[in-house]
């Protein structure tokens, strides 16, 4: 897990660093472009101001009459202003589209505007080290170039250089043959020119590549912005829906112990969230289940009553005589009201719809009376016993209850 988190952090840091680097490069290019434009504007404004001033002075000097001395001074000032004007604002036919403009003075007293390549060539021609020192770079490269160089083929060019370039002519007259030989002089010169042309070609290629890169990056940023806007406009929100899980219905059972004098121990179980249509089940023969089922409620209460020993004896007697128990038809929703007499606890019967002390609602929704309950009780059970047997069973029950009351009082 740690390795996964480290990889994630490393990838995130790498992406962040790359994004910051790209943004910084873009900002640098913008600043560089702004500075270039600013310098161009300042240079143009300055040139315009100087030209306007020179033209104003020329006009003023032309209007005013002067003596011969004044004419000389005026001519000198006019020449100076003309040089400045031609330098800062050259005519269209002499304008060179380049990054660097160099003003070079000629032996005739005039000036020429050179670009960076021409300026370096002029500097190379006027430098004595070009002819005296060994060529720069690896010797193998110089030997390779020398194998393709022919001095005889350059005679016309050499003659033109000696005529048109006073610097080369002066250095050639001074050095050949005192310092260097004629062949070495021109070999070193043309090799320097060859290296200068290579550097110029590399510079132009780099410039074009930088311009193409800037153009492609600007197009890439525009495409990314448009794509981001399109995706942001058409993206759909995702809704994670989790269906509700039905909670398990767990019955909660509560056991309540009451003194034997009032009622036997009872266990009450409450079942929540149960459907209203519940069919009670029949339990063991030794337990009586008064069950309350409410149709509109969401709970079922089951009360378990422990029988007395007399009830067990009476139950055994009833089973010997072949008592047949008849279950009444299930009623929708009986309701518990009061406790029935002690005899209802002793008779071990299965009650599904009504308790001894509860009124049973009829089919039309009205509550029944205790008389109806007694009649239903008599109809449900037909005891095949004599009157003497019933009296004997009741006397045993009374005796048992008296003994239990005495035991309870003695225990207290």
From Swiss-Prot:
Amino acid composition bias (Acidic residues), ranges on this chain: 373-390, 400-412
Statement: the UniProt record of this protein carries the keyword Nucleotide-binding: no
Ranges of Polar residues composition bias in the record: 259-272, 298-308, 353-372
Modified residues (Phosphoserine): 308
Annotated BSD domain residues: 145-197
The organism's place on the tree of life at top rank: Eukaryota
Keywords: Phosphoprotein
Extent of Basic and acidic residues compositional bias: 208-217, 328-349
Keyword Phosphoprotein: yes
Residue numbers spanned by region Disordered: 208-227, 253-272, 298-412
A Pfam family reported for this protein in Swiss-Prot or TrEMBL: BSD
One cellular component (GO) term of this entry: cytoplasm
Protein's name in the database: BSD domain-containing protein 1
Gene: bsdc1
């Amino acid at each position: 897990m740690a390795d996964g988190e480290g990889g994630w952090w490393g990838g995130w840091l790498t992406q962040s660093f790359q994004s910051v680097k790209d943004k910084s490069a873009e900002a640098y290019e913008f600043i560089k472009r702004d500075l270039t434009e600013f310098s161009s504007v300042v240079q143009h404004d300055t040139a315009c101001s100087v030209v306007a001033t020179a033209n104003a002075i020329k006009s003023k000097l032309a209007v005013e009459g002067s003596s011969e001395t004044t004419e000389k001074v005026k001519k000198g000032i006019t020449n100076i202003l003309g040089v400045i004007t031609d330098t800062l604002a050259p005519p269209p036919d002499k304008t060179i589209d380049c990054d660097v403009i160099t003003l070079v003075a000629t032996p005739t007293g005039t000036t020429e505007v050179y670009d960076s390549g021409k300026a370096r060539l002029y500097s190379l021609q006027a430098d004595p080290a070009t002819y005296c020192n060994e060529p720069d770079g690896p010797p193998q490269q110089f030997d390779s170039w020398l194998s393709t160089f022919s001095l005889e083929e350059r005679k016309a060019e050499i003659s033109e250089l000696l005529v048109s370039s006073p610097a080369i002519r002066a250095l050639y007259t001074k050095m050949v043959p005192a310092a260097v030989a004629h062949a070495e002089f021109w070999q070193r010169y043309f090799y320097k020119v060859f290296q200068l042309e290579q550097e110029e070609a590399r510079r132009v290629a780099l410039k074009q590549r930088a311009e193409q890169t800037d153009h492609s990056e600007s197009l890439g940023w525009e495409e990314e912005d448009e794509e981001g806007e399109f995706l942001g406009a058409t993206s759909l929100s995702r809704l994670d829906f989790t269906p509700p899980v039905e909670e398990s219905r767990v019955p909660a059972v509560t056991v309540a112990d009451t003194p034997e004098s009032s009622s036997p121990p009872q266990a009450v179980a409450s079942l929540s969230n149960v459907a209203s249509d519940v069919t009670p089940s029949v339990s063991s023969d030794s337990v009586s289940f008064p069950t309350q089922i409410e149709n509109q409620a969401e709970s079922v209460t089951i009360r378990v009553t422990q029988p007395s020993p007399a009830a067990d004896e009476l139950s055994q007697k009833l089973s010997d005589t072949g008592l047949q128990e008849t279950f009444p038809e299930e009623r929708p929703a009986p309701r518990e009201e009061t406790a029935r007499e002690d005899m209802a606890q002793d008779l071990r019967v299965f009650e599904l719809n009504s308790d001894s002390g509860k009124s049973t609602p009829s089919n039309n929704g009205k509550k029944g009376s205790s008389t109806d309950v007694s009649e239903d009780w008599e109809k449900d059970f037909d005891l095949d016993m004599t009157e003497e047997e019933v009296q004997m069973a009741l006397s045993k029950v009374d005796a048992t209850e008296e003994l239990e009351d005495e035991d309870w009082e003695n225990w207290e």
